[in-house]
Design a protein with these regions (language model features):
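Alpha-helical transmembrane segments of multi-pass small-molecule/ion transporters
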Residues: 1-314
Length: 314
């Protein structure tokens, strides 16, 4: 029950922020043009700063576990490959990129540490899970959203070059790289800088969620209900059911299993919507999957946690 309450506290708050954005739009306080400007701002400043702050304070050398990081990386890569394969069955090719990203991209950085701290009292292996998965999440998001952009026809040198430039100049990837470099060099984080990073990064989620809610089109969302439900099922149930037994067989337990659970089965992150909108996609599937997985993840995560506890794994 405690885990259900914790999950509900985390997910309901996120959902209410989206509803608040929708409400602001309906009463004329946050029109679509304003919401789109907020999206661009969140994408360029607060979100990269948030990820930088999460990774910069991690002691990589002390917490390092090569097997665990490699496992997280490989499973993330396989998950993305599966999502790409399933997306080929979609009739509407214009939503393929959004579907792929929404199906694999978790709220790992935002939810991972908090979820494990609630259970064990410390962040455990969450930082290593973030290192193994989040950089790949974002690099592949740029690749997927570039190659499967609406109206895009085939691959060519210009597209490959544009994608590579997109990866190296993507604000989120720059934030992750800066955070990892800061941590690897063991640079001190002055109190003033830490407070500034926390303050700027702290607005990423609420602003991004409200902007997403403000641009959410209910009619269009219902028109994309089938791919939305499929992507949400893959995100919350499919990948966990496939890969969690493998993690158990390999020997991962307790904090590591919880970190893997969050990586595989947490709600789709709001940054997937922010990035999709900023890379020329409609954003309807992204926002719909974020909303649906956010509503359902409190119950699915708690269900998976209950199953693992019954088997004495956590």
């Amino acid at each position: 029950m405690d885990n259900l309450v914790f999950s509900l506290n985390a997910t309901v708050a996120i959902f209410l922020m989206m509803v608040l954005g929708l409400f602001f739009n309906k009463i004329g306080w946050m029109d679509e043009e304003f919401a789109n400007k907020i999206n661009k701002f969140v994408f360029r400043i607060p979100l990269p700063v948030l990820l930088f702050g999460d990774l910069a304070v991690v002691d990589i050398k002390e917490a390092w576990d090569t097997k665990f990081v490699i496992f997280c990386f490989i499973i993330t890569l396989i998950s993305i490959t599966i999502a790409i394969g399933i997306s080929c069955l979609l009739k509407d090719r214009n939503i393929q990129g959004e579907f792929i990203q929404a199906a694999y991209r978790s709220s790992a950085a935002l939810l991972g540490i908090a979820f494990i701290q609630n259970i064990y009292g410390n962040s455990g292996q969450a930082p290593l899970m973030i290192i193994g998965s989040v950089p790949l999440y974002n690099i592949m998001a740029v690749v997927v959203l570039s190659f499967f952009k609406p109206g895009q026809k085939g691959m060519n040198k210009a597209l490959v070059k544009k994608t590579l430039i997109g990866i190296t100049t993507n604000p989120i990837i720059i934030g992750i790289a800066a955070g990892l470099l800061w941590s690897a060099l063991k640079l001190p984080m002055p109190v003033i800088l830490h407070k500034a990073v926390s303050s700027i990064g702290g607005v990423a989620t609420p602003m991004g969620l409200m902007a997403m809610g403000a641009t959410f089109d209910i009619k269009k969302a219902f028109g994309k209900i089938k791919p939305t439900v499929i992507a949400a099922f893959i995100k919350l149930v499919g990948f966990v059911a496939v890969f969690m037994p493998l993690a158990v067989v390999i020997g991962f337990r307790r904090e590591k299993l919880i970190a893997i659970l969050v990586m595989l089965g947490s709600a789709t992150t709001v940054s997937s919507y922010v990035m999709a909108k900023n890379m020329g996609h409609e954003g309807v599937v992204s926002s719909s999957v974020v909303m649906l997985t956010t509503m359902c993840s409190a119950f699915t995560l708690t269900g998976w946690l209950f199953i693992m506890k019954c088997f004495g794994l956590v």
